[in-house]
């Protein structure tokens, strides 16, 4: 992702560590998860500083939620406990030294499917506001240049055969997003401390909806 300093720094760290391994034998194993989450962290495509609650709040209020492009880019989300299965298989594994591994769910879904799953869990209609990624990247409030234009607006598909081979752990039954998301949503709804108001994001969503509507005229 050339748009995001966070991603460029991670790539630079990998290069540094692998070079040190080649030079001195420094024991390094690189692990690349994909959008790992738990009950306290719900993956959505676009959110503000307060996290996913503001998105759930909009959906429950019958408001539209911003979605980059047409919502059909592919994404992969992995629960922390599923990630841990293969991660533990790499710990102390000499065959993993000097290697890099993906550890991700085998389920690849679109962002439309993500939001429809959330709508079904909440018992509401899915009301997207499709916004071009380049337009979101113009935001002065959020760094959507890196996280959307260079990241979540693009499709990703991962091959986990390497980590299965090296750990000796076969395919596991990864938690489907609809199941993991339900667990997260129920946690959010039952824990008031997770329900953080985010008026800046709400105002941003309303503004983006107005701008997007004007572009369609």
Q: Which stretches of residues belong to each language-model region?
A:
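Glycine/small-residue-rich pyrophosphate-binding loop that anchors the diphosphate of NDP-sugar donors
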Residues: 74, 152-155
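Glycine/proline-rich active-site loop of Rossmann-fold NAD(P)-dependent oxidoreductases
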Residues: 24, 36-54, 90-101, 124-125
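Glycine-rich "substrate-gating" loop/helix at the edge of Rossmann-like oxidoreductase active sites
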Residues: 34-49, 69-81, 107
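Structural element of the ATP-grasp superfamily
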Residues: 13, 17, 59, 162-164
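Active-site Tyr-X1-5-Lys
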Residues: 1-30, 39
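Mid/C-terminal beta-alpha module of Rossmann-like enzyme folds, strongest
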Residues: 89-149, 160, 165-166, 175, ...
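A conserved pocket-lining segment of Rossmann-fold NAD(P)-dependent short-chain dehydrogenase/reductase
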Residues: 54-78, 90
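Conserved loop-to-helix N-cap of the C-terminal "lid" that shapes the substrate pocket in Rossmann-like
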Residues: 30, 71, 76-84, 100, ...
């Amino acid at each position: 992702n050339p748009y995001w300093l966070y991603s460029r720094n991670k790539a630079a760290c990998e290069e540094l560590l692998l070079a040190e391994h080649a030079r001195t034998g420094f024991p390094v194993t690189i692990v690349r998860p994909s959008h790992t989450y738990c009950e306290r962290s719900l993956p959505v495509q676009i959110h503000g500083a307060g996290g996913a609650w503001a998105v759930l709040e909009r959906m429950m209020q019958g408001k539209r939620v911003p979605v980059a492009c047409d919502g059909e880019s592919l994404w992969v989300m992995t629960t922390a406990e599923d990630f841990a299965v293969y991660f533990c298989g790499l710990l102390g594994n000499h065959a993993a030294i000097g290697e890099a591994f993906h550890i991700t769910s085998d389920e690849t879904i679109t962002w439309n499917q993500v939001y429809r799953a959330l709508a079904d869990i909440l018992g509401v209609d899915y009301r997207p506001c499709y916004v071009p990624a380049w337009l979101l990247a113009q935001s002065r409030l959020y760094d959507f240049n890196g996280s959307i234009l260079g990241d979540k607006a693009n499709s990703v598909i991962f091959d986990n055969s390497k980590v299965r081979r090296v750990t000796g752990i076969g395919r596991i039954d990864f938690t489907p997003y609809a199941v993991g998301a339900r667990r997260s949503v129920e946690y959010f709804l039952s824990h008031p401390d997770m329900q953080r108001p985010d008026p800046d994001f709400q105002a941003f969503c309303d503004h983006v909806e107005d701008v997007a509507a004007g572009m369609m005229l």
